[in-house]
A protein has these predicted regions:
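Extracytoplasmic thiol/disulfide redox context detector
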Residues: 2-92, 96, 138, 142, ...
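Cysteine-centric redox/oxidoreductase cores and disulfide-bonded domains
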Residues: 90-179, 184-197, 201-207
């Protein structure tokens, strides 16, 4: 058996601590980087983190965003108790294109753009083919200062595309997402309906 003297033991403990701190820092840095790529509302210090995985062409997701999100914002986000994190989980090409537009646009308008995409979902998602749907989407975001040229550039932005697709793959592996919207509160998938009553009950247990 190899016996360690006191100095060796101290050195080993210090080395382990340094490695642990380095790994923790890398994990923290990755978390910050990932959040920069997401659309986030609310304080980073909030006790409750609510992840919303959704597809921009999903009617249930639109209903959740229009009817439930404002209630969560008013009761928990504005008070600093909760943070909302919107994560794209596109289920079709039209949703993927809308996600690309969302994430390659200026951070300052992303929330407004997300609201508009959901509010006008019934208008822009109807079309004979993807080109018509893209043109519909261009029309409904025009008054937010988004040009046709900017839209076209977003569609061919491989960096943005890869981030969205990799995020979708990672989310599916981590949370086994089978439908949208899927709500994850403090890293636990919400069971049951994604309605305000159910979410409120979960939040109240955590604050």
């Amino acid at each position: 058996m190899i016996k360690l003297n006191l100095n060796n033991k101290i050195f080993l403990l210090v080395k382990i601590c340094i490695i642990y701190l380095f790994i923790s820092f890398e994990s923290y840095a990755d978390d910050l980087k990932n959040k920069k790529d997401m659309i986030v509302i609310g304080s980073h210090d909030a006790l409750v983190k609510i992840k919303v995985f959704s597809s921009l062409t999903c009617p249930h997701c639109a209903n959740f965003h229009i009817k439930v999100v404002p209630k969560i914002k008013k009761e928990y986000v504005e008070s600093g108790k909760a943070q909302l994190i919107f994560i794209d989980f596109p289920l079709d090409q039209a949703a993927f294109n809308a996600s690309k537009l969302l994430h390659c646009s200026d951070k300052n308008i992303q929330i407004k753009l997300l609201d508009r995409i959901y509010e006008k979902q019934n208008e822009w998602t109807v079309g004979a083919d993807i080109n018509e749907i893209n043109n519909n989407l261009k029309k409904i975001v025009k008054n937010l200062g988004i040009s046709s040229n900017h839209f076209d550039k977003c569609l061919i932005d491989e960096t943005v595309s890869d981030k969205i697709l990799n995020g979708r793959i990672d989310a599916n592996k981590k949370y086994s997402i089978s439908a949208t919207p899927t709500i994850v509160i403090n890293e636990k998938k919400l069971e049951g309906s994604a309605n305000f009553k159910n979410i409120k009950k979960k939040i109240e247990r955590l604050i």
